[in-house]
């Protein structure tokens, strides 16, 4: 299965609590932090919810 490299590109300041929790669940903390996750429907759903905050690349 493919892997996704997810980078937090925008700050969480002023964002609603559900978006903050979603970013935290993805394992992202500070701006420009990067995580590599397996590509599955659950991760894709979380990325969709915060797509305006993150950058995603297939690895």
Curated annotation (Swiss-Prot):
The keyword Zinc does not apply. One of its GO terms (cellular component) is cytosolic large ribosomal subunit. This is Large ribosomal subunit protein uL30. One of its GO terms (biological process) is translation. One of its GO terms (molecular function) is structural constituent of ribosome. It comes from Listeria monocytogenes serovar 1/2a (strain ATCC BAA-679 / EGD-e). Part of the 50S ribosomal subunit. Keywords: Ribonucleoprotein, Ribosomal protein. Belongs to the universal ribosomal protein uL30 family. CDD domains: Ribosomal_L30. The gene is rpmD. It comes from the Bacteria.
């Amino acid at each position: 299965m493919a892997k996704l490299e997810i980078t937090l590109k925008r700050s969480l300041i002023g964002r609603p609590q559900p978006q903050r929790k979603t970013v935290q669940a993805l394992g992202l903390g500070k701006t420009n932090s990067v995580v590599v996750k397996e590509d599955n429907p659950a991760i894709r759903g979380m990325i969709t919810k915060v797509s305006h905050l993150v950058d995603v690349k297939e690895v």
